[in-house]
Amino acid sequence: MAGSGVAKQIFALDFEIFGRVQGVFFRKHTSHEAKRLGVRGWCMNTRDGTVKGQLEAPMMNLMEMKHWLENNRIPNAKVSKAEFSQIQEIEDYTFTSFDIKH
């Protein structure tokens, strides 16, 4: 029976990471981790020296990525603060992969 699988609930949140997160390959590592976890969305450097972005994934994957953003072990990076929007359920993905915006 085709299509008999249960659809996964998808959730989304926005993030902004503060600290020493530019010039230390933070976006590259974030993209790699998101792809490893099956998280879709994007990240980019801001003019204020932060990295911000959006995440979309099933809840467990989203929470793993959120934890990674707060506690990563990227050489030379130092997160001083991580801000996240409220998690919202969405009907379907709006991104097809995880991208680094320039």
UniProtKB/Swiss-Prot annotation:
A molecular function (GO) term: acylphosphatase activity
Identify the domain of life: Eukaryota
Q: What class of enzyme is it?
A: hydrolase
| E.C. number | 3.6.1.7
Instruction: Give the matching PANTHER family.
Output: ACYLPHOSPHATASE (PTHR10029), ACYLPHOSPHATASE-RELATED (PTHR10029:SF3)
Q: Which family does it belong to?
A: Belongs to the acylphosphatase family.
Full protein name: Acylphosphatase-2
GN (gene name): Acyp2
